[in-house]
Every structure is written in structure tokens, then in C-alpha cells.
Regions:
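A short acidic, amphipathic alpha-helical/loop segment
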Residues: 56, 127-134, 155-159
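Conserved phosphate-binding/catalytic region of the ribokinase-like
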Residues: 183-299
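Extreme N-terminal starter segment of soluble prokaryotic enzymes
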Residues: 1-4
Length: 299
């Protein structure tokens, strides 16, 4: 039972119709790790500056997140600023400051190299490729990406795609990557490139999971109060892989159940700004919402 998550730890400045928050803790690695920690003890890999809150590092420890792979450097942590309108699926990037990520090359501690599952969260595809050289025969490798990397490093994306089992990306990114408007055709194109699964995140409409012999759709939990959608996709990936790491099985029913747990974690993450909701979330709440999902799709 071993899940390694390689991703960003950052400060986010977020403006939504429901409010504004300046320099709150976020980042793909942060959301993925906290979501996964409800099922397993993930190991995180990333870099932060001296300004990163010690309280969050204590939170990781309390949740069983292994931080041996977390590097603290002199300087400022990664900072992203973005704006959301009333459509939570659309966001505008105002500013990105990479700070301590300048020149960063992740190095896995020896204890991380035998991981069963590796998640290459939303980082530079060249860094994702570096990680794959360092791991030894994982059972499952997943990657996430974004339109920035698809547009600027398409060859690197395709190179990494050939080496992974799962791609997580939203519908816009899937279409951009394949130049296909139809998501089913797009999913088949990506499967032909190497991965065994394509998980297409569709925001408030849930997600589609494409396998070579099946397609599975999962709802997004109906939510009246969408406060901050920033960490939804990363929380989905963390919940999905955290559950698979817990059970150590990868059958079609297991994949379907993992997708529902991913959607459950995402539905909680959006209820407050940043990681605040994940900090107060309980196993009891997760179980109750999972059962509610079953009722939503039963007929």
C-alpha cells in the first residue's frame, strides 16, 4: 500500500462571485494528498518556500501524509491568481509566479521509489518524465495535465502518455489534446496512445471514465453552494487513487467505485475556499455522501 503524489504546493489568490481570498494554500499536490489521506497514507513530492505555513505541514503529518519528499527552499512558494465567473467550469488566470519552482527537479527519496501507485499531478511533463525514470515497476501510474502544457509542450505530453496507465484531464483539455470535439472519439484516441484509462473531468457534470472495453459515467453531487472550484479536479484524482491504493485491486467494478469516491471528495472540496473543507471533513460525512450517490442513480 503505497501512493506517491508528485505535484505543486502553492498559494492561490482566488476571486469568485461568492468572495475573494488572497494567498490561501492550494496546489495540485496539496489537494490530491489531502483527498487521498482519507483512504491511505500518501507520500508527497514537491517544493515550497520558507513562507509556506508550518500549520499545513502539521496538517499533513496529522493526516498521515509522508512529507520526506517535500523540499523547503529559500524564497517564495509558487503563487497562482485566478478569477471565476458564474460558470465554475471556466476560469481566467490573472498571474502565475513560479518562484521556488524555477529550476526545480524533483528527486524521489529511496523509500518512495517502490511505490505501488504514482500520481504525476499537474506539473511540467518533462518533470513527470523525470519521475518515471526514478520509480521501480509501479502497479499503476496516472498523470494529470492542463492546457498550458498541451499548448507549449505537446511532444513531451505524448511521450509521457505512452508510459502511463491513466490520464486525468478535463473535457476542454481532452479536446485540445486530440483535436476531437466528440469526447468518445477523443477518449479512444488517447487510449490508442498508451493509457488504459482516460478520466475526463466535466466539472459540475461529473466525469466520464473510458476504458478499452467500457465507458462509465459518474455524476457530480448536486451542490447549492459552490464556493471555490479550484481544487475539485485534484481532489477527484486524490480520492480516486487513494481508494485504489487502499483496496489494491483494479477491476472494472473497483474503477467505478473509485470514480464515485473521487466525485464525493471533489463535491466536498468546492464547499469552501482552498483546503478549508478538506481540513474539517470526516469519514462519516464521506460515507454518507457515497450512500447518497447510490440513491441518486438508482431507479
Amino acid at each position: 500500500m503505497s501512493l506517491v503524489i508528485v505535484g505543486s504546493l502553492a498559494f492561490d489568490t482566488i476571486q469568485t462571485p461568492w468572495g475573494r481570498r488572497d494567498r490561501i494554500v492550494g496546489g495540485s499536490g496539496t489537494y490530491c494528498s489531502l483527498a487521498a489521506s482519507f483512504f491511505t497514507n500518501p507520500k508527497i513530492v514537491g517544493v515550497v518556500g520558507k513562507d509556506f505555513p508550518a500549520a499545513v505541514l502539521r496538517l499533513f503529518k496529522a493526516r498521515g501524509v509522508d512529507t520526506e519528499g517535500l523540499e523547503v527552499r529559500p524564497g517564495k512558494s509558487f503563487h497562482w491568481e485566478g478569477h471565476y465567473g458564474y460558470d465554475p467550469n471556466l476560469r481566467e488566470t490573472i498571474r502565475t509566479e513560479i518562484n521556488v519552482y524555477e529550476g526545480y527537479r524533483p528527486q524521489l527519496p529511496a523509500s518512495y521509489r517502490k511505490a505501488d501507485i504514482v500520481l504525476l499531478a499537474n506539473i511540467d511533463p518533462d518533470l513527470q518524465d523525470d519521475i518515471l525514470i526514478q520509480v521501480r515497476k509501479p502497479k499503476l501510474v496516472a498523470m494529470d495535465t492542463m492546457n498550458l502544457w498541451i499548448g507549449s509542450k505537446p511532444k513531451a505530453i505524448r511521450r509521457v502518455l505512452k508510459k502511463v496507465d491513466i490520464l486525468f484531464a478535463n473535457d476542454e483539455e481532452i479536446r485540445m489534446l486530440t483535436k476531437e470535439a466528440n469526447l468518445i472519439k477523443a477518449g479512444k484516441k488517447i487510449l490508442a496512445a498508451g493509457p488504459r484509462l482516460v478520466v475526463t473531468k466535466k466539472g459540475e457534470h461529473g466525469a466520464l471514465v473510458f476504458g478499452r472495453k467500457f465507458i462509465f459515467g459518474v455524476l457530480a453531487h448536486p451542490c447549492e453552494d459552490v464556493v471555490d472550484p479550484t481544487g475539485a479536479g485534484d481532489s477527484f484524482a486524490g480520492g480516486f487513487l487513494g481508494y485504489l491504493d487502499k483496496i489494491q485491486r483494479f477491476s472494472h467494478p473497483d474503477i467505478r467505485r473509485a470514480a464515485v469516491y473521487g466525485s464525493v471528495l471533489a463535491s466536498f472540496a468546492i464547499e469552501d475556499f482552498g483546503i478549508d473543507r478538506l481540513k474539517t471533513l470526516t469519514q462519516r460525512e464521506i460515507g454518507a455522501r457515497f450512500r447518497r450517490f447510490k440513491k441518486l442513480v438508482s431507479f
